[in-house]
Amino acid sequence: MKRRLVITTLAAAGIMLAACQRQAETMLEVTGHLFVFNYRNASATYLLTMKKTAPIPDGSTIVAEFENPQGGTPLVLNQKVFPMDDKISVQSENLHCVVKDRPYSVTVKLVDKDGKLLQELKAQFKSDLDQTVLPSKPLVVGAGYERNPEVFKPDGTTDFSNTDKCPA
């Protein structure tokens, strides 16, 4: 009788402890997303920031698929997630043809080291600037930020034109 009571009590305690442990619905949460326009380098990129909300298995990777403003296939970025990182930033390669007030989508997949999907996030980017505000060529070159002679001509004129060929 006493043995049965001990087993029943332990089983009940085990069930209660298991019920108290919350299974994490998400491991990552989007904390910010924006376009970064860098006039000095004549570049535009997507920047997505996330915070870790639960432990992520070692060897996990983020696979981000950014909509390509020029059209065509998405821009794909693979980035390893390190266990000590509480905040994670993902930045795309340089973009061309970003249009003001047009929504652009990104899909972020968190996969483990075996490629198993752990979580999928979606976000929408919208720029309050058109990429035509950027020059086609960087304003500066080199480590000393020297004026770019292709933009700042020897005769005193400047060429800030944007020569991107974008779909209408």
Name the predicted role of every residue range.
Residues 116-167:
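Short beta-strand elements
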